[in-house]
Amino acid sequence: MSEQNKMLMRRAIKEVWNGGNFAAVDELVTSDVVLHLSKPGDEIHGPEGVRQFYTALHAAFPDIHFTIEDQLADGDKVVTRWTCHGTHQGEFQGMSPTGKQISVTGIDIDRIADGKVVECWPIMDELGMLQQLGAAP
């Protein structure tokens, strides 16, 4: 089961995160999926929320690419350590495009049930990204 769960997350990264195939979200997440973002209480709910999140990310960084650096699975959880690169070409969190390149590291912890993501806890170097964009010292 752990290997199947890892394959599910590899597919999500290949098709949605990198490929922009937002229609695949319905095949990858449950109808009540929750993404628990790093700010307490900040959450994304349901497949439509997930689609909107990745659509906005791809609009801001059209060339974004995630690379899996490491992946572990135990029981119903998969931990994926990743690096992403992209160019800020569209509005991102209220910030106008800067044309700057980013390189950001992060980890996602995903809980899988019946072959779909039920919950996700993404953690990334947000400060490092903002510094690269010139929005933080």
Region annotations inferred by a language model:
Residues 1-137:
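C-terminal and inter-domain tail/linker signature
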